[in-house]
Amino acid sequence: MTSQTKLLLIDGNSIAFRAFFALYNQLDRFTNQDGLHTNAIYAFNNMLEIVLKSVKPDAALVAFDAGKTTFRTAKYADYKSGRAKTPSELLEQLPYIKELLDDMGIQHYELKDYEADDIIGTMAKRADDAGWQTTIVTGDRDLTQLTTDQTTVQVTVKGVNELEAYTPEHVKEKLGITPTQIIDLKGLMGDTSDNYPAVSYTHLRAHETCADL
């Protein structure tokens, strides 16, 4: 029996952010001779080594956001507008994280007007259709909607080295819904992190089903 091809997809911005804050209390300790902060680079590299050893992927890709402007902000200008600016100490490390990936032979990709999530979602769907076994590593629980029988989403719990594996069964156990229903739930409840509002109670009372909305 032929074994499944294994694909590893990593949410670059999300993991870099969590890597940075995992060692934020040691920020001054993690600097090189030129004054470059290295805490995110160090923690990101540790996470990579652990995940690569665990998953043993045949192919791997790290997706990054291409910028603050996306097709979503074109439709809704306030999308993610409430978020604090990315710390300069983290921004200066991102090019070196990408250089680290190059040195390890791991591909990374970003696409204008799209987020890393969009790249990961597209790649995961294509891999699923091809019968591949996919592991997604992220700090964003929104990506648990991508779980299938062949796709597992590993979400950071503490720092970047402790991960919680989400399968369709685990999503059902924790949320009481299926992965495909997460998008409906988020649409109804809104998301303060992404700065979009919930559907009002008046609208919910006026319609019997999500389809009617």
Where in the sequence are the language-model features?
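Domain-level signal for Mg2+-assisted phosphodiester chemistry and nucleotide/NA-binding surfaces
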Residues: 1-107, 158
